[in-house]
């Protein structure tokens, strides 16, 4: 049995983290505690979490039907497959916000989140090119059959850069499960938590959330590492044979 003062200190830190991360459950909070050097059994953290009344309230799904996600083949390296999609939101005055989300299916990194009032196929191609200049071009991009993604501009961009476009079947969002999962987190932890009054404000807030998502947020599919941490380890592992060859 842990002394009361230890439980009190752990609970206090747990409450503080939960207030900073309003949409995190106990598993992610436990990962943050571990990262800080506080090593506590996850069952103990769960008990203190419940006793402190910190359980995250589940938001109702907009669509009443539960859909089972299809199992997608997991890529084996960064830049093997990127997934792209749109998430819609609005400013306080009702004007539409369109967010282009780009995710690396292997590292789970949010490659970019582009925010504007309107985004055409040519705009999508330009933003992918901007991301690729920094990260390298992906081998393939998975997307739905929206008009921006089936446009001549994106098709020409993909052909020119040796990128395969993988179009999912119409009406089958589960075939794009990796980015559907990301979009759910983006809406729950960012869009639903903020009230945007201008496009500039939305861009600043969303860029900050994306950075935090990549660099700090523990990801369950990556053994609670952040995407950036996981990606850095992958790059280091991939670089080892190349270094040895030149010795």
Residues covered by each model-derived region:
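Charged DNA-binding/catalytic regions of mobile-element recombinases
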Residues: 1-247
């Amino acid at each position: 049995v842990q002394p009361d003062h230890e439980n009190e200190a752990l609970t206090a830190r747990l409450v503080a983290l939960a207030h900073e991360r309003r949409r995190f459950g106990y598993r992610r909070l436990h990962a943050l505690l571990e990262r800080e050097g506080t090593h506590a059994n996850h069952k103990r953290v769960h008990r203190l979490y419940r006793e402190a009344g910190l359980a995250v309230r589940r938001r109702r799904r907009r669509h009443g039907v539960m859909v089972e996600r299809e199992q997608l083949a997991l890529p084996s390296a960064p830049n093997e497959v990127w997934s792209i999609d749109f998430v819609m939101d609005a400013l306080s005055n009702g004007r539409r916000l369109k967010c282009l989300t780009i995710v690396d299916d292997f590292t789970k990194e949010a490659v970019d989140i582009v925010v504007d009032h309107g985004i055409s196929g040519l705009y999508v191609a330009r933003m992918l090119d901007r991301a690729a200049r920094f990260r390298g071009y992906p081998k393939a991009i998975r997307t739905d059959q929206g008009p921006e993604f089936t446009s001549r501009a994106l098709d020409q961009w993909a052909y020119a850069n040796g990128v395969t476009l993988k179009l999912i079947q119409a009406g089958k969002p589960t075939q794009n499960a990796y980015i559907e999962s990301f979009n759910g987190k983006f809406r729950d932890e960012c869009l639903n938590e903020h009230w945007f009054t201008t496009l500039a404000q939305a861009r600043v807030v969303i860029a900050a959330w994306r950075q935090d998502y990549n660099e700090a947020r523990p990801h369950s599919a990556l053994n609670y590492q952040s995407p950036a941490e996981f990606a850095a380890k992958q790059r280091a592992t991939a670089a080892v044979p190349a270094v040895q060859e030149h010795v």
